[in-house]
Amino acid sequence: MIRVPPPVRPGAPFRGGTLTDRLVEPRVPRDLHAFIAGLPKAELHVHHVGSASPRIVSELAARHPDSKVPTDPEALADYFTFTDFAHFIEVYLSVVDLIRTPEDVRLLTYEVARELARQQVRYAELTITPFSSTRRGIDERAFMDAIEDARKAAETELGTVLRWCFDIPGEAGLESAEETTRLATDDRLRPEGLVSFGLGGPEIGVPRPQFKPYFDRAIAAGLHSVPHAGETTGPETVWDALNELGAERIGHGTSSARDPKLLQHLAERRIPLEVCPTSNIATRAVATLDEHPIKEFTRAGVLVTINSDDPPMFGTDLNNEYAVAARLLELDERGLAGLAKNAVEASFMDPAGKARLAAEIDAYTSSWLAS
């Protein structure tokens, strides 16, 4: 059994390699890593601020020296050591506080797209929390313009299509829910790339049903429902997300494995789970990789997608997460291609876009196996 020795050092500047390097490299053949590196992909659960690379975090911290976020890479590695989920949220919010101008927003967004493109991610639904920026004084119109400018540049220059999920920061209460809903549904502000509406932050003490009126408004405005649920609480939170918030996909859903009826429900209705294995270890939502419920999900026939969540903070990226999945599920190239196509199916791309990306995955896999 593989265990993460405390303290977990999930930050990308981790000395001696990333968390997933330590866990996966000895057990996954190098040619499979090479296959993963070139595999065309879609990513559905990746956070905007949580994707800030150590270089960008250091640059932003230097721009805003009143922040407590360190600029030194060694100190940043220590800073990105999380004791539990609550501590992760505390650190995450301190990085959010570095995003103070529209220029910061555009820089971050484009650099996130650049990193996705490096991993052959053709399409990504990036979770953005506009409330966290507008409450810090960024003009809401300027914020929308910044993410849209970066989105268009990324598609033209990098070949990566970005779409947005606006999420409610649950720890900020119903005020944030109202503001996020307004920004997501006001046609004068709503960005062209917005496709979905979510709910993040702590689950404990933040019951999902209280957000039903806001999700109802977002769904009525044509947005898809993709709340986090069952990451740090039990399967009842997933049921609430489904029954009260109209969830079409579940962010994490880790505890779903504890409820056979829920697994059956997810499988029969083809409701995808956005699985983020390394994140679950780093935040202590799951004790060890060997105990991760991804195996139970696939055995039950649940549509599983692989995602990186907050990759630099957890010392991972999407390629590493596919390697984790290969190790846990004993997958070969065709199995990994199947996971990539799961993400395409579960995405909110138009049918033509889904068909193109699925065909590209098939062509890449066939070419690889024939070589």
Label each PLM-derived region with a short phrase.
Residues 3-5, 14-223, 232-237, 244-249, ...:
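Metal-cofactor-binding active-site regions of metalloenzymes
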Residues 10-12:
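Targeting/processing segments of secretory and organellar proteins
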